[in-house]
Amino acid sequence: MSEFISVTYKCVGSDLKDLFKLYEAFWTNDNNKSRKDDWRYKCCIDFAPIVASLGFEPKQYELHGEVRSYHLEGSTLVIDSVTGYCEQKDFRKCIEAKFPSIKVYYGEDDPQSASYYTNDSNGDYFPKYFLESYDNTNFFKTIEDAAESVSTLVGSYVAPSADDIYDALDNYYSGNVVCMEDRYSFREYEVRND
């Protein structure tokens, strides 16, 4: 397990007013004058001030991480963060407690230990399978779609199983000269229900 991992949160709201209030909590903390004067906070926001602005006492929660970026995509607030060791369940639960109309899904990516987790059991916001390269990621809801994409990449049929996809990519890259940046790795999210 890595010391720091990437976690993307997708806050999906049925009530846009609540979603905008949540966005405002991020924006307010991001544009806080006292924070802006401290060079350490030029590019990120700690979880604790956000939790405090939602009306919770940060010291009561395990909060190890910081928001790197956030933006709205329709009725979804996307939060890209770096966290300590694992997805920050307390951060997510504080948002859901403050705004019951918002469900927070996460995708936890730790390439160093090859572990990928999500709480999105339907794959609506974090599809289960994905091919990842240096600067491109393709998501797939089914193993068949992932296998079809790999078949196109390697130029031959690949059976729809994780082992066959791994083998096809390994064989393809061992027999072809491909820049590291252009190599794809196959990944699967493991669903955690909590």
What spans do the regions from the language model cover?
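Short, extreme N-terminal segment that most often corresponds to the first beta-strand
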Residues: 1-33, 192-194
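A contiguous, well-structured "functional interface" segment within a domain
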Residues: 11-18, 38, 49-56
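A common structural junction motif
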Residues: 26-34, 97-104
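Pyridoxal 5′-phosphate
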Residues: 34-41
